[in-house]
Amino acid sequence: MRKYETVFILNPALDEEGYKANVEKFKGVIENSGGTVDNVDLWGKRKLAYEVKKVSEGYYTLMNFTADTELPKELDRVFRITDTVIRHMIITQE
């Protein structure tokens, strides 16, 4: 099992409930695949450094998790097919 960190930005058109529901969805993907979520840090709505997909702000979330090496590929797939995700990044912690 390895430690990973992901940051994802969600569409600002979501309300607070939609934002938290999406975060829970991604936590569920990790936990249902045998991983554990170590930390979730909700940064809230912030301005983007540059416009992405015609939006200039978004809901930022930092999530630390522990999982096997296949889980980041599945999480990346889920991020890509979720319309509310503007940007995401998954890195390995050392």
Swiss-Prot record:
Keywords: Ribonucleoprotein, Ribosomal protein, RNA-binding, rRNA-binding. One of its GO terms (molecular function) is small ribosomal subunit rRNA binding. CDD domains: bS6. One of its GO terms (biological process) is translation. SUPFAM superfamilies: Ribosomal protein S6. InterPro entries: Ribosomal_bS6, Ribosomal_bS6_sf, Ribosomal_S6_plastid/chlpt, Transl_elong_EF1B/ribsomal_bS6. Signal peptide: none annotated. One of its GO terms (cellular component) is ribosome. The keyword Ribonucleoprotein applies. Pfam families: Ribosomal_S6. Belongs to the bacterial ribosomal protein bS6 family. Binds together with bS18 to 16S ribosomal RNA. This is Small ribosomal subunit protein bS6. The gene is rpsF.
